[in-house]
């Protein structure tokens, strides 16, 4: 019986899998990973040991000893996932979870060898990310500025006030997604104390709760100043809401904005300026990286601003730079 679909897990599943509970505590306390990441690791590992339980004919996961797992077991698991139509990228992620678990067992002296040492991660095709051209980015923010200015009219009442507030907020959110290359979780989690308008930088808390400093330009600074003023006036009139959270970006009810709101917002504003199928917040992060490298920024600096742990991830964006150089060569060289 195949177990390729992700399983729903409970505390008893974790308890039944030897050493899994200790590994999850290690992730949370030592590596500072998010709850979402811990859930992903747990799901992947329980799926792995559920598969081994079925393969071995046992009734309970507790009967499967991680120390006795062989290379062939891991390869059969990967083959089962592939046969079930799981994409190579998802298989690679699941394999990475299993590798992390066994690395923990080795590091803590629970086992002397890992069956993962001879298992290679599937080779993945690195897709070029969607991004806006510089002209499309200009149209996006020209549209936002115009909408923001038009919202300051004679209309009165709560509906008009909410519209002015949301336009100012949306413009500031999109300026930071593009101007600083922030991740969705980073912009929704941004604290008031993280914004330094005087010196023009943000203190960003990224993956693994790692913090970094990211500069921003005058357009983003102007959008933030405008938003802070509109937000202050809006909640002063309402006399409620804004004091409930320390977050920069809030809803009209004063609560922290949530990912789906930003995703809908991004799609709405990107739709008039690009035909790309992926109109999401990450597209603006891709655009930030692409435009920075095209403008001559060095790879290491862009990598630091994006919060990448290694340069390899950032190198994905250099394709545009190479294309630009190829175009220049083709147009200029007599033997191109």
UniProtKB/Swiss-Prot annotation:
Organism lineage: Bacteria, Pseudomonadati, Chlorobiota, Chlorobiia, Chlorobiales
InterPro entries in alphabetical order: CB, DNA_brk_join_enz, Integrase-like_cat_sf, Integrase_catalytic, Integrase_recombinase_N, Integrase_SAM-like_N, Tyrosine_recombinase_XerC/XerD, Tyrosine_recombinase_XerCD
Core-binding (CB) domain span: 14-106
UniProt domain Tyr recombinase: residue ranges: 127-330
UniProt KW Magnesium keyword: no
GO cellular component, one term: cytoplasm
Entry keyword Transport: no
HAMAP family in the record: Recomb_XerC_XerD
Name the record gives this protein: Tyrosine recombinase XerC
Subunit field text: Forms a cyclic heterotetrameric complex composed of two molecules of XerC and two molecules of XerD.
Single GO MF descriptor: tyrosine-based site-specific recombinase activity
Domain of life: Bacteria
